[in-house]
């Protein structure tokens, strides 16, 4: 077991500071001299791009970023007076009439930039640091423009908790201006018949089941929906409750259910009456859902102002939305379902069961031939699944669409018969039919079609690498707000989203004291694949560093790994050598993970092990002492895959040789690290430190605002001693 007071762990003198902050490529004396020269010149250089600045220039003309004082790098561990909590405005702000608070530093700049861009019909892409109040400034700037131009604001969020924050800010705005807002969620989150059930049903399948039940209610047939019947009766009550209380999504759902009404149906009917509608990404990313969503908002004649929260997630979300797979479980259960049906003809003399079995045989054959020892994927040539069907049953390629339509119709009839019996079960035949149709019409230029192998067996994968539909939609908008705390490089986001050339890009730093956060990295370990293979001791050295850091920082600590696999492999050593309360993010077990997280947050010196890019790293706030220390293991470059290779090649062709890897691997990895570091500081008084255990961080020290440390344990002890001496 690692001893709690490791030799050298309490070194807090001159050598420790020199090691941490004096190794940026120059001897320490030279570094001080350079800083002194700059300081005496009035700090006339941009800290980001090194461009010369004019006197009193607030924004760098070269890179567009707000200029900050370089300051004294040795003062970063010192505690200074913190920014006071944001105050409610006493009188209306004439320059920002929808801003309910006394503005913090930079907030008026952001609001003015948003309004100016929107008034000019332009998109604005913003990276805004923690504490700038992304939600309130985007609403304040967006609402002023929307009200003047008769637009409805659609605020897109990745999580329900983010939509709840929008409602909280709208409630504050309502105290100074008449405003209304409502949160919309998907059927699977709001439908009383399916809410809380552990089902993985595609939205289009759930929509069909819902429409069928509503149709039965309207016809007075059995198998209808009692919640739908009640909704219109109490709709005025729901509207009044929403406009008076600005409820969260959960609060509104409970209110509707208390009246015996369907929350989903009520929101759908009411949203056209509200100024602001918050919704998950899928309401815009899915073409089918978007069409219905816009119709419910008032139709094409209702102009929209889109505000995208956590915009760095939108591109991946768009790809995931358009991607799909066909698993052996889907195929096997569809075959079983066919055996219960007396009539299953999908063509002249052709049964659905025979078609599906042929597809299963094709998948098995390709897997046997192409996926050997150590391989888990094989990129399929064009028509690899379709050709055996054509050969077997003797029809033309154009007939395949009729075959899949017939399978879908069989599934619909199957669900009708189940509903007659009061059974909510999904037809596997219908679900498979939809997936097969999508497979056969998906463009090979936009999708990577592959056969893959997992622990559960073989499956067909259609991974979207070019979500052109959302790009087309974004370009059709006359202005939108794209915001995130980790969106750089902004020009890359601009290109991938296909935004107009006149799009405005802005970066705003956090107003919180820089001294409250420290980021350091080490240069003697790495999780780079070839180096870990070449040096068998690398894993052990990383494990020991994690253990020593956890031992010597008597604070709540989050350890972020680049993958679940690495976390699993290191777990036995860490459980043996860290004598503290330990908690783990469990892949595929969300409830278990959340219970562990609740216990971790209640303590003061526990260690929670997680994965970068997961829900803990991006979706959870840890105010105060809930989190003080982050250990980041490695650089989370995505693992090699057919999709990564295809996307990289696509971006190389579009934007220039070498940019493909940067866009698909480097930027997402750095963004994940920045998101993980961002968990540390969530308000003015938070203090936190992050240690990156990977020498490759030296390449990204400017983006990560990190300094090299020769003794991270000593530097962590020194940083947290400032807290104990307060």
Region locations from a protein language model:
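Walker A/P-loop NTP-binding motif
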Residues: 115-116, 135-149, 168-172
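Conserved helicase motor "Helicase C" RecA-like lobe of SF1/SF2 P-loop NTPases
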Residues: 562-586
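A contiguous, basic/glycine-rich beta-loop/short-helix subdomain that forms a polymer-engagement track
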Residues: 252-275, 285-296, 403-526, 534, ...
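Conserved interdomain hinge at the start of the Helicase C-terminal
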Residues: 527-562
């Amino acid at each position: 077991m690692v001893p709690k007071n490791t030799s050298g762990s309490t070194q807090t003198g001159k050598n420790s500071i020199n090691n941490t902050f004096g190794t940026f490529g120059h001897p320490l004396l030279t570094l001080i001299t350079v800083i002194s020269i700059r300081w005496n010149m009035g700090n006339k250089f941009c800290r980001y791009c090194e461009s010369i600045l004019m006197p009193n220039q607030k924004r760098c003309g070269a890179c567009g970023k707000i200029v900050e004082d370089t300051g004294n790098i040795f003062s970063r561990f010192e505690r200074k007076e913190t920014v006071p909590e944001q105050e409610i405005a006493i009188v209306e702000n004439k320059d920002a009439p929808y801003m309910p608070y006394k503005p913090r530093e930079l907030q008026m700049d952001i609001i003015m930039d948003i309004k100016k861009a929107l008034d000019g019909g332009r998109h604005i892409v913003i990276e805004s640091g923690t504490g700038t109040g992304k939600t309130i400034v985007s609403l304040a700037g967006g609402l002023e423009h929307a009200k003047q131009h008769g637009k409805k604001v659609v605020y897109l969020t990745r999580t329900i908790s983010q939509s709840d924050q929008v409602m909280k800010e709208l409630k504050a705005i309502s105290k100074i201006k008449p405003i209304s807002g409502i949160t919309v969620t998907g059927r699977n989150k709001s439908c009383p018949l399916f809410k809380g059930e552990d089902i993985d049903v595609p939205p289009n399948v759930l929509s069909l089941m819902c429409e069928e039940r509503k149709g039965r209610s309207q016809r007075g047939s059995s198998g209808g929906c009692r919640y739908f019947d009640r909704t219109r009766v109490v709709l005025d009550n729901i509207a009044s409750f929403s406009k008076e209380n600005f409820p969260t999504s959960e609060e509104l759902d409970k209110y509707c259910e208390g009246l015996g009404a369907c929350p989903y149906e009520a929101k759908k009917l009411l949203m056209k009456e509200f100024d602001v509608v918050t919704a998950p990404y899928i309401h815009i990313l899915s073409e089918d859902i978007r069409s219905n969503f816009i119709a419910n908002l008032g139709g094409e004649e209702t102009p929209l102002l889109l505000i995208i929260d956590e915009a760095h997630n939108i591109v991946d979300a768009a790809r995931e939305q358009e991607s799909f797979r066909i698993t052996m479980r889907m195929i096997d259960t569809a075959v079983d379902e066919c055996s219960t049906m007396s009539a299953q003809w999908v063509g002249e003399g052709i049964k659905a069961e025979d078609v599906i079995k042929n597809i299963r045989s094709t998948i098995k054959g390709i897997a046997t031939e192409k996926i050997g020892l150590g391989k888990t994927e094989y990129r399929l040539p064009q028509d690899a699944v379709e050709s055996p069907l054509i050969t077997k049953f003797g029809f033309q390629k154009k007939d395949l669409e009729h075959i899949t339509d017939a399978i879908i119709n069989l599934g619909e009839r199957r669900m009708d018969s189940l509903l007659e019996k009061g059974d909510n079960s999904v037809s596997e035949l219908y679900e498979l039919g939809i997936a097969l149709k999508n497979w056969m019409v998906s463009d090979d230029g936009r999708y990577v079609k592959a056969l893959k192998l997992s622990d559960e067996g073989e499956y067909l994968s259609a991974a979207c690498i070019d979500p052109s539909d959302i790009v087309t939609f974004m370009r059709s908008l006359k202005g939108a707000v794209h915001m995130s705390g980790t969106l750089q490089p902004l020009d890359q986001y601009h290109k991938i989203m296909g935004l107009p050339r006149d799009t405005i890009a802005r970066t705003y730093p956090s107003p919180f004291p820089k001294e409250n956060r420290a980021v350091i990295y080490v240069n003697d370990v790495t999780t780079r694949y070839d180096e870990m293979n070449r040096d068998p001791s690398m894993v052990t050295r990383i494990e020991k560093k994690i253990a020593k850091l956890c031992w010597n920082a008597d604070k709540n600590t989050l350890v972020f790994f680049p993958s679940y696999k690495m976390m699993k492999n290191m777990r036995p050593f860490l459980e043996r050598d860290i004598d503290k309360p330990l908690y783990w993010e469990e892949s595929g077990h969300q409830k278990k993970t959340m219970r562990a997280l609740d216990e971790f947050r209640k303590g003061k010196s526990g260690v929670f092990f997680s994965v970068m890019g997961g829900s803990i790293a991006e979706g959870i706030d840890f105010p105060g002492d809930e989190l003080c220390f982050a250990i980041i293991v490695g650089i989370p470059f995505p693992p090699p895959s057919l999709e990564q290779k295809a996307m990289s090649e696509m971006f190389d062709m579009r934007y220039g040789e070498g940019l493909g890897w940067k866009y698909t691997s480097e930027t997402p990895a750095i963004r994940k690290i920045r998101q993980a570091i961002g968990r540390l500081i969530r308000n003015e008084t938070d203090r936190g430190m992050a240690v990156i255990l990977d020498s490759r961080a030296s390449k990204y020290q400017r983006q990560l605002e990190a300094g090299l440390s020769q003794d991270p344990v000593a530097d962590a002890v020194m940083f947290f001693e400032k807290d104990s001496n307060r």
